[in-house]
Amino acid sequence: MAQEVFQRTKPHVNIGTIGHVDHGKTTLTAAITMTLAVNSTCTPKKYDEIDAAPEERARGITINTAHVEYETASRHYAHVDCPGHADYIKNMITGAAQMDGAILVVSAADGPMPQTKEHILLAKQVGVPSIVVFLNKEDQVDDEEILQLVDLEVRESLINYEFPGDKVPVVAGSALMALQALTEKPNTLRGENKWVDKIYELMDAVDSYIPTPKRDIEKPFLMPIEDVFSIQGRGTVATGRIERGILKLGDIVELIGLNEKIRSTVVTGLEMFRRLLEQGFAGENIGVLLRGIEKKDIERGMVIAQPGTIEPHTRFEAQVYILRKEEGGRHSPFFAGYRPQFFVRTADVTGVIEAFEYDNGDKTRMVMPGDRVKMIVNLICPIAIEKKMRFAIREGGRTIGAGVVLQILDSTQLKSKNK
């Protein structure tokens, strides 16, 4: 059967459900797809279809994630739901499904729980820009005051982790009651059932409060170099996939990483699948011919970027998940001073792990497989890194961890330019 062509008629937003185990994340995901299926071509998903999540691999780590899609009147959404708590942590740190926004599900009967707060913190660390709250299980709460207390408590938790808790939309409802109504009458329309209406109200809040993300094409140009070769009589060609932005013939670009010099050069040729291009766009695999650059000046792991938009650094703080033995990770702990390989974009660089600490600020000398820690890393040579970047940690050919850069620590702007 021929594959259907994806018609992009509405802005696309990636979203996910976060929150404590058993507060109703997967039930809500099912209720949203069934509610919105009435007005769109997207397929409704039952709870057990979402809960039997397929395995994904991101940066060498297996993650159980379920992806569903749905549409509102104004947007197309891709929604990720992870059944297990560990899967959430791995998904958010590896960026297997990067979220433009999240729906935080909190049981109105229980209020915020430890995992609720952990997910809010993690959302902040990995750069989820906006959160909308769904107070689930409203049908189990008889007292309006309890609902108001939980609302207040959730807002305080969000403020504690630097989200604008006083402005965040909070919608109370019952995913299970909505799901039951939709199971009995699949084409329930707005205004026909109070619980289904709450799902519409939630999606109205998501539509209006979570901003449409800036598309990669609008960002400054950057391409990690995958391979380099010489064309006799023409010069040096670097190949790779454009991560963001647009590259045009005649553009001035910088070569950054693996040494302290930032070289400046001009793009004299662009090609894709052996066809000449006037310009290359984010997501495309291209070859770039660079003026006055010899093969020895450029290698895999460097990036080609719009001048002044990214710099080489060696030292950074990161949030890292260390794989358990069962996930193919280490069998034993490691200590400060450990020197694994860091895979950042196409670069593969040795780094020294100088220090660790847990989210509560407790320092530790030893990290166990399965831990999630902050660490300070010092690479042996500078590479183009920036906040929110993802990376893998490897040792002896296997992935032992995955991380996201929280902040750059070295202040040395390695800008001895050689133009």
Swiss-Prot record:
Ranges for region G4: 136-139
Hydrolase is among the record's keywords: yes
Entry keywords, A to Z: Chloroplast, Elongation factor, GTP-binding, Hydrolase, Magnesium, Metal-binding, Nucleotide-binding, Plastid, Protein biosynthesis
Residues noted as binding GTP in the record, renumbered to the chain: 19-26, 81-85, 136-139
InterPro entries reported for this sequence: EF-Tu_GTP-bd (IPR041709), EF-Tu_GTPase (IPR050055), EFTu-like_2 (IPR004161), EFTU_2 (IPR033720), G_TR_CS (IPR031157), P-loop_NTPase (IPR027417), Small_GTP-bd (IPR005225), T_Tr_GTP-bd_dom (IPR000795)
Any one GO CC term of the record: chloroplast
Nucleotide-binding is among the record's keywords: yes
Region annotation (G2) ranges: 60-64
Highest taxon listed in the record's lineage: Eukaryota
CDD domains: EF_Tu, EFTU_II, EFTU_III
Subcellular localization(s) per the UniProt record: Plastid, Chloroplast
Region (G1): 19-26
Reaction(s) catalysed (UniProt annotation): GTP + H2O = GDP + phosphate + H(+)
Record-annotated tr-type G domain positions: 10-214
Region (G3): 81-84
EC number: 3.6.5.3
Binding site for Mg(2+): 26
Family: Belongs to the TRAFAC class translation factor GTPase superfamily. Classic translation factor GTPase family. EF-Tu/EF-1A subfamily.
Role noted for this protein: GTP hydrolase that promotes the GTP-dependent binding of aminoacyl-tRNA to the A-site of ribosomes during protein biosynthesis.
Protein's UniProt name: Elongation factor Tu, chloroplastic
Annotated source species: Chara vulgaris
Gene giving rise to this polypeptide: tufA
